[in-house]
């Protein structure tokens, strides 16, 4: 693999341990990866380290792997990011009062990640949060440029989260994955990486904007289906 390891040997860092990030982190752990979960909330970190789920109505179906030597949870970006081969950003993207997208969580998480990458190795930074086409390149790409992080240090990608928050019975393994990345080699490797956690397809689709647009179209289709049903 381009990160210097065989697929399956990577350390995966998941930033944002909510309804998307926590199941994603646990899915990678369950298939053998070393996983570092990062969250800025002390409540979330403390609950997970005590073996409790911070998610409402999930305790009966989510078992936190406390005690596993492949699982750790922290709020410390400085220690966790440099140890990781792949960093997944799974933070919320709410809307502002005027219905414009609020990207502050994405910007804050991306900045904390990029400030702490190991410049002596390549790290794949994958945004999973729901965004409009162009955000990964504009927000994360411009941060990389301002910090002097070229593609040999940080390779950006987008893989839209497609789980249904709160649906703990139909998990991430039931959802197909798509990956957009300007680097075809890394994008293809990331698609194979995500294939480890799903029973459905995992496909490299080319540019990041293609993957971003696919999530937007999926959401529009869902809204149309709901409107027609009503």
Describe the predicted segments one by one.
Residues 17-18:
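Glycine-rich Rossmann-fold phosphate-binding loop(s) that bind the pyrophosphate
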Residues 142-158, 163-230:
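Internal alpha-helical scaffold of NAD(P)-dependent oxidoreductase catalytic cores
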Residues 89-92, 129, 182:
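Glycine-rich, N-terminal phosphate-binding loop of Rossmann-like dinucleotide-binding domains
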Residues 21-22:
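N-terminal Rossmann-fold NAD(P) dinucleotide-binding loop
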Residues 95-162:
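Rossmann-like NAD(P)(H) cofactor-binding subdomain of soluble oxidoreductases
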Residues 2-10, 34, 40-86, 93-100, ...:
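Conserved N-terminal Rossmann-fold NAD(P) cofactor-binding segment
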Residues 25, 29-30:
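Gly/Ala-rich phosphate-binding loop of Rossmann-like dinucleotide-binding domains
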């Amino acid at each position: 693999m381009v990160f210097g390891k065989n697929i399956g040997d990577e350390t995966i860092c998941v930033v944002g341990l909510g309804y998307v990030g926590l199941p994603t982190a646990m899915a990678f752990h369950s298939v053998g990866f070393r996983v570092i979960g990062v969250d800025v909330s002390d409540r979330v970190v403390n609950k997970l380290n005590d073996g409790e789920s911070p998610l409402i109505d999930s305790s009966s179906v989510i078992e936190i792997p406390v005690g596993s030597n492949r699982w750790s949870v922290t709020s410390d970006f400085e220690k966790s990011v440099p140890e990781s081969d792949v960093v997944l950003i799974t933070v919320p993207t709410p809307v502002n009062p005027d219905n414009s997208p609020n990207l502050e969580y994405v910007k804050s998480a991306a900045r904390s990640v990029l400030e702490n990458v190991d410049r002596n190795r390549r790290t794949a930074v994958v945004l999973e949060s729901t965004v409009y086409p162009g955000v990964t390149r504009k927000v994360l790409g411009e941060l990389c440029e301002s910090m002097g992080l070229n593609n040999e240090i940080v390779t950006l990608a987008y893989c839209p989260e497609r789980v249904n928050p709160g649906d703990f019975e139909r998990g991430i393994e039931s959802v197909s994955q798509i990956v957009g990345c300007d680097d075809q080699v890394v994008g293809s490797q990331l698609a194979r990486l995500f294939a480890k956690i799903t029973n459905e397809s995992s496909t490299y689709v080319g540019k990041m904007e293609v993957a971003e647009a696919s999530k937007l179209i999926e959401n529009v289709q869902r809204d149309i289906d709901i409107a027609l049903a009503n």
